[in-house]
C-alpha cells in the first residue's frame, strides 16, 4: 500500500524546507549567532553515523602516525583531503537532504554549522579528544563547494 502520493511527498518536502528556513532565521534573530551555532553543531553531531565513527576510530588506533590515519581514512572517505599541513573535508555539492533543494539565498549559511558538528563528531570520536573545525566555504552562502578545515 502506498502511504503518500508523489505530489504529497513533494508538498511535504517543500513544507519542511520552509520550516527549516524559518527555524534558522528565527533562531538567529531571537537567540543570537553563538547559540544558533551551538544548537546546529549539536544537531550535526546527532546526524553522524556511529558506525562511521567506529570505523574511523579503528583506523586511528591501527595507524602508526597521524599521517597514516589521514591517508587511510581518506581512502574510505573521498571527501577528506590534505593540503600541505592542513586537513579538509570538501564537498562539491550540498549533501544535506534537509536543505539542498532550498534555492540559494533563502537559507542563512549559519545552517552549515550542522555539517561542522558532523565533521567534529567524526574526528573527536576517532581521536578521542577535542578538535576544532572551521567552515571556510559553504555552498549555501554561494561558494562553489563546502570546505571545512580540521584543526587537529
Annotate each PLM feature.
Residues 110-128:
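Active-site helix/loop of acyl-thioester processing domains in fatty-acid/polyketide metabolism
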Residues 130, 141-145:
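Coil-to-beta-strand transition motifs
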Residues 1-111, 132-135, 139, 152:
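N-terminal accessory segment detector
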Residues 145-152:
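C-terminal edge-of-domain segments
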Amino acid at each position: 500500500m502506498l502511504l503518500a502520493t508523489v505530489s504529497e511527498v513533494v508538498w511535504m518536502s517543500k513544507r519542511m524546507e520552509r520550516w527549516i528556513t524559518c527555524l534558522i532565521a528565527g533562531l538567529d534573530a531571537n537567540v543570537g549567532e553563538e547559540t544558533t551555532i551551538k544548537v546546529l553543531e549539536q544537531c550535526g553531531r546527532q546526524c553522524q553515523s556511529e558506525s562511521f565513527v567506529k570505523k574511523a576510530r579503528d583506523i586511528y588506533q591501527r595507524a602508526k602516525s597521524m599521517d597514516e590515519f589521514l591517508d587511510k581514512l581518506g581512502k574510505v572517505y573521498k571527501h577528506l583531503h590534505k593540503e600541505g599541513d592542513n586537513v579538509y573535508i570538501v564537498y562539491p555539492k550540498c549533501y544535506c537532504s534537509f536543505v539542498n533543494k532550498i534555492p540559494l539565498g533563502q537559507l542563512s549559511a549559519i545552517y552549515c554549522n550542522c555539517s561542522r558538528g558532523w565533521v567534529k563528531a567524526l574526528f573527536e570520536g576517532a581521536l578521542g579528544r577535542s578538535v576544532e573545525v572551521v567552515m571556510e566555504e559553504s555552498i549555501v552562502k554561494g561558494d562553489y563547494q563546502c570546505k571545512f578545515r580540521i584543526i587537529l
